[in-house]
Design a protein with these regions (language model features):
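Peripheral, non-catalytic segments flanking oxidoreductase cores
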Residues: 1-114
Length: 114
């Protein structure tokens, strides 16, 4: 709810990469738990493959020794990486009203898929 009392329309769920590939430390809603292996894990795996390709390109363009950036992102070690799913229903256009306000993303890479 904002200062005027208007309710939020945006829903978020964050799924930790560690929970996808290792023992989950969080309990997720039933639909996520049910589809963790068939939908969530393949999605996260493909996203990581895309990010690894981008890191390889950056690594090459920066003239770093091969694998330098990937070494900073080991797959099976604790990480702060997560998949975030955002649900926001269509709204009438209002240039002064945004569903997701200004914010800072964290980490090495952020992939946005719509």
């Amino acid at each position: 709810m904002d200062a005027t009392g208007e309710l939020d329309t945006v829903e978020f769920i964050n799924i930790a990469k560690d929970d996808v590939f290792m023992n989950p430390s969080h309990k997720y809603p039933a639909p996520i738990e049910r589809e963790m292996v068939t939908i969530v894990k393949p999605f996260v795996q493909k996203s990581l493959e895309v990010n690894q390709t981008i890191l390889d390109i950056f690594n090459d363009k920066l003239g770093l020794p091969e694998g330098t950036l990937l070494e900073q992102h080991p797959l099976h070690e604790h990480s702060g990486s997560e998949a975030r799913i955002i649900k926001n229903p269509p709204m009438p256009h209002d240039a002064h009203k945004r569903a997701i306000g200004a914010h800072t993303d964290f980490g090495s890479l952020v992939s946005f898929l719509e």
